[in-house]
């Protein structure tokens, strides 16, 4: 019996980030919208052919997006807030970009939709927003156009959409924020999906994939009935001849599997990486509907290590004990891994053979399915299976005994800072002499073409290290002078020497590997190139001390030392799979601790340890939060800073996340000051800070740096006022949402000037 193969989705940015380059050229006025459309078409065609040639049977379509798949779904359902409609753009792409980035120009001035992390990944989605004008209906033809585009090439695809349950659970109300999901809304949304199924049936589609990752979360009152209501109304549209694959990922659906089974979906996608044990038990206990094919998600779409074929085969065989209808699939979309290992030959074959990026994962899916066709004797004789097993026999790296000994010697006292925070705050106010509502930035300043060009010249050997260092010193001189000129209270050196907040540190730590082109989409056109944790981690030498010391010598104002924290380095790297995340984080924490103490010795009085990604990997089910994550992630941060003097002020920063539910754990990090990325979330974190009697001083971001908009002084004053209404004035800091690296100077300096003016005005009112 032939075993079908499937993937949930494929990276959309292109092997060389062609999509990013085309869209950004359009935004800068250097390309037309037709150029962007043509680039998109070329990428889709290239990827479909690649997937077909790799032997994938159920090839996805509509997994492509110019910005974000949730945003595309909102547009498809006509969930377009009135403020964007009023802009009156002639083409849907401009409206979509305004929703994603905001708009400031002759047509008006509107903020962007909120942006949040996509479950536990580093991908960000735009939050669909319902307002009083919303009329849910089918809008546009994107999914159908892309299906027909593939069909014209002779490629049959499986259209992919975000499912209605996930779409509604991740949406919000423009006014109340929490969306009221009443019967009328459920029916309207389900009817659109039913119409989509019928249209695809008329076009000849055999399968439609509905992604429902929200099913892996804890179920609250009304959740199961919502799922039932949606699918009871839309599934009869299958009668038109199309099959429906309910696809889940990022965890298990054990608590709703029995309900899912009753609907007799044509296919059910199960994550057998992150939800392995629970999903297997659910299938074994409840069985499988006769018409249902189980899509066994055995190829990891979230890490870059080679698949262990023997383990994957065992998982598929376990499902085959329950049903003969099994397909081999990716555990989630391959959106979250780089394009291909081709072009990374500098790593050497002995290293590279351990990695599989998106293209190689297509081959893994096909190869596992092929191996499943063999009998036991043929499997034992399979050279492919033997070659794969050789990757997992024995140890890949030699342990660093010095690092292991440091970890073994850690005691409880190493995780505790003295004295308590209240006493430290008093000492720090005396030492630093800052005003009420102190102003600062998160760390990075715009990296211009010139900065990137000089870094490239150094890499190519066209300039010496000394010439490059002199260039960086001039950049620091300039940014320090400008910060003083506009009146910021706590300064930063701008991070011009850093290509990336994680990769830069990895390049100065033992145990890391780096790629040339392994880019992954984070949001829109923003891409990241995570380093790879290959072996045990330790600090090779001081990393930031020289630049921070130089910057401090250029000003009498406090200069922040800027570091990336251990949990964020782990979460924004490709972590090892041969030792635990906890062990890797302790290694990183000790390395960054060494850097913190060296900065303090060099006279840096404020040290920021960014934990931008702390919330990102919080398990999706609350019962797992502490046991599987927070019980080691929070102490790891404390380990980094526990040995500094009481007068040294420790800052941290966190990016797009939901903080409300772990606000007490964040307080337990025992930082002195924390800045939150909050402006796109309407500062809802303020309620959590207030209700939890949050002790850490805090700076909820007062403007959104992911949008090119320049906020007015009045707008910023309003934001500050919202903070003051919920927080102790002595604990409020004023700062942007995030680092300014990706913005332009033309946006950055006016925005910061307005921020400082707003802070001074509010300060004067307090006096």
Curated annotation (Swiss-Prot):
Function, please?
Answer: Catalyzes the transfer of a methyl group from 5-methyltetrahydrofolate to homocysteine resulting in methionine formation.
- Encoding gene, per UniProt annotation: metE
Tell me the protein's name: 5-methyltetrahydropteroyltriglutamate--homocysteine methyltransferase
Q: Enumerate the residues binding L-homocysteine.
A: 442-444, 495, 610
The taxonomy runs: Bacteria, Bacillati, Actinomycetota, Actinomycetes, Bifidobacteriales
Positions of Zn(2+) binding: 653, 655, 677, 738
- Report the active site residues: 706
Mind telling me which HAMAP family this protein's record contains? Meth_synth (MF_00172)
One GO MF term: 5-methyltetrahydropteroyltriglutamate-homocysteine S-methyltransferase activity
Could you confirm whether the keyword Nucleus appears in this record? Answer: no
Going by the entry's taxonomy, the superkingdom of the source organism is recorded as Bacteria
Q: What keywords would UniProt list here?
A: Amino-acid biosynthesis, Metal-binding, Methionine biosynthesis, Methyltransferase, Repeat, Transferase, Zinc
Q: Locate the residues binding 5-methyltetrahydropteroyltri-L-glutamate.
A: 17-20, 117, 526-527, 572, 616
Task: Specify which residues bind L-methionine according to the UniProt entry for this protein.
Answer: 442-444, 495, 610
Q: What class of enzyme is it?
A: transferase
Task: Report whether Amino-acid biosynthesis shows up as a keyword of the record.
Answer: yes
UniProt family annotation:
Belongs to the vitamin-B12 independent methionine synthase family.
Q: Which cofactor does it need?
A: Zn(2+)
- Recorded coiled-coil stretches: none
